[in-house]
Amino acid sequence: MKISEYTKEMMDENSFIDLAYMALSEKGKEVNLYELIDEFKAIGNYSDEEVETRVVQFYTDLNTDGRFLSTGEYMWGLRDWYSVDDIEEKIAPTVQKFDILDEEDEDSPKIALLGEDEVEDELDLLPSDGDEENVDTEDEEVEDELDEAGLVVEPDEEFEDEEDEFDDEEEEE
């Protein structure tokens, strides 16, 4: 019996993944995922809400069931149709090729090396000596509130010693 001859009851008895296997076996060619779902919706007279509840599981099953193979964007076929070499070609990741730069290219202002912009942006964020723009205003507000309340915060000497060591290490670099 062809899937197009199924009744609503027969559609309800089967999972979408089993129906997809039957549909792909009948067609003998890869099919778009959305076409499959639309076909199931039409045959089973499903509402949009009914389809939505089943589609999530269906898509998960398609990806985990070894009988199916994604052959492109939203295209699915049966793994049995393809040789091992074909499968490797279909699912092999695309490798991007880059030109190798020599020292002259690296000095060119037209070429930005990977990560170069990020480093410059990070350097802009670092406070420099006498740079009042980078003072954290939130810290100033907290200090003002403490002064107004008459609270005295004593510095943690151990913390300051560690901070001094950290500053010394940064200067050495």
Swiss-Prot record:
One CC-aspect GO term:
DNA-directed RNA polymerase complex
Annotated HTH HARE-type domain ranges read 14-81
Supply the PROSITE patterns for this chain: HTH_HARE
Q: Which GO terms describe its biological process?
A: DNA-templated transcription; regulation of DNA-templated transcription
Q: Which portions of the chain have biased composition (kind: Acidic residues)?
A: 115-173
Q: Where are the transmembrane segments?
A: none
Q: Which GO terms describe its molecular function?
A: DNA-directed RNA polymerase activity
Q: Which domain of life is it from?
A: Bacteria
Q: Provide this UniProt record's keywords sorted from A to Z.
A: DNA-directed RNA polymerase, Nucleotidyltransferase, Transcription, Transferase
Residue numbers spanned by region Disordered: 113-173
Note the subunit structure: RNAP is composed of a core of 2 alpha, a beta and a beta' subunits. The core is associated with a delta subunit and one of several sigma factors.
Which function does this protein serve? Participates in both the initiation and recycling phases of transcription. In the presence of the delta subunit, RNAP displays an increased specificity of transcription, a decreased affinity for nucleic acids, and an increased efficiency of RNA synthesis because of enhanced recycling.
Q: Which family does it belong to?
A: Belongs to the RpoE family.
Which protein, by its recorded name, is this?
Answer: Probable DNA-directed RNA polymerase subunit delta
What organism does this protein naturally occur in?
A: Macrococcus caseolyticus (strain JCSC5402) (Macrococcoides caseolyticum)
At the highest ranks, the source species' classification is: Bacteria, Bacillati, Bacillota, Bacilli, Bacillales
This protein's encoding gene = rpoE
